[in-house]
């Protein structure tokens, strides 16, 4: 039997790219939100140095797996062509695989974080040892998915997640290199 590998699961919005401040009175699917994913390609901006950070993670022996909820397609706040343009840029990054859930919160799927379905699917596909893996995110749903899968949880610090508790809190993604 092949040796199981460790992975670093990464959320997309708020971890590898900037989130968008929509202001105090913005609603998506009936829920008031301030910080969102980019809805259009011209709003999409990768974090500085992300490609190099991902290379270093890979050189440290970890698989790099993107696990991202993208319900804005379902909610109608993002078109499929805009999503595809954004994902074309993401696919240029040194990632080993990408798992996307486009379901809305009412769809009751197993893949949408905080459920761990995307992590379990990646673990099965890539023979990943979840107990020696990390999930890096910026929301409670990222932390909850990692906890449910048995991963160490890492939170990228932000103004909107001060009430979220994870195993490790970092200022930016580059800080993970010191930890792994």
Regions found by a protein language model. Name each.
Residues 37-40, 71-72, 103-105, 127-128:
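A short, structure-level motif marking secondary-structure boundaries and short turns
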Residues 1-61:
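Active-site neighborhood of HAD-like aspartate-dependent phosphohydrolases
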Residues 13-15, 70-71, 115:
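Anionic group-transfer/hydrolysis microenvironments
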Residues 50-87, 95-104, 146:
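Substrate-recognition element of Asp-dependent hydrolases with the DxDx(T/V) motif
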């Amino acid at each position: 039997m092949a040796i199981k590998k460790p992975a670093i699961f990464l959320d997309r919005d708020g971890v590898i790219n900037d989130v968008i401040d929509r202001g105090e009175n913005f609603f998506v699917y009936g829920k008031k939100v301030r910080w969102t994913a980019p809805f259009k390609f011209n709003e999409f901006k990768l974090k500085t140095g992300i490609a190099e950070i991902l290379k270093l993670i890979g050189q440290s022996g970890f698989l790099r797996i993107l696990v991202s909820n993208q319900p804005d397609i379902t909610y109608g706040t993002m078109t499929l062509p805009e999503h595809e343009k954004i994902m074309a840029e993401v696919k240029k990054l040194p990632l080993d695989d990408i798992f996307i859930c486009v379901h809305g919160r009412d769809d009751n799927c197993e893949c949408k974080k905080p459920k761990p379905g995307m992590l379990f699917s990646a673990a099965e596909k890539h023979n990943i040892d979840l107990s020696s893996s990390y999930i890096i995110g910026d929301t409670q749903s990222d932390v909850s998915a990692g906890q449910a899968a048995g991963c160490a949880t890492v939170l990228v610090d932000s103004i909107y997640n001060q009430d979220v508790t994870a195993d490790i809190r970092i200022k930016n993604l580059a800080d993970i290199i010191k930890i792994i």
